[in-house]
């Protein structure tokens, strides 16, 4: 299972990458999540400008066999939705790069420290 060292993770299998500006983060689902979901056919998110609470739902991922909610790792505002998600299969093929889901402006960047480290996430999924 691919668990990049430069990201933080949630128990709900989302990942977050804090960008160099220190207030913007990229969010997506993990390789483990996409493999458990199976073939992803549709991703829907709340619109740009939506404020989301930490652990609040910001969208859904629809796969052939199920629909799963997406939860914000930390509180913030959605500032961009990945336009490449029109082809939702990109989340299966490249969940950490081209398959990112939203960019958020964080309310409190210090919240990132409360997320799981790569080692902790690896232990969570039994890797």
Swiss-Prot record:
As stated in the Swiss-Prot or TrEMBL entry, residues carrying the post-translational modification N6-lipoyllysine are: 65
Q: Which CDD domains match?
A: GCS_H
What SUPFAM superfamilies does this protein's entry cite?
Single hybrid motif
UniProt remark on cofactor binding = Binds 1 lipoyl cofactor covalently.
GO CC aspect terms: cytoplasm; glycine cleavage complex
One of the Pfam families matching this protein, by short name: GCV_H
Q: Residue limits of the Lipoyl-binding domain?
A: 24-105
Checking NCBIfam families in the record gives: gcvH, PRK01202.1
Q: Which family does it belong to?
A: Belongs to the GcvH family.
Q: How does it assemble?
A: The glycine cleavage system is composed of four proteins: P, T, L and H.
Q: What is this protein called?
A: Glycine cleavage system H protein
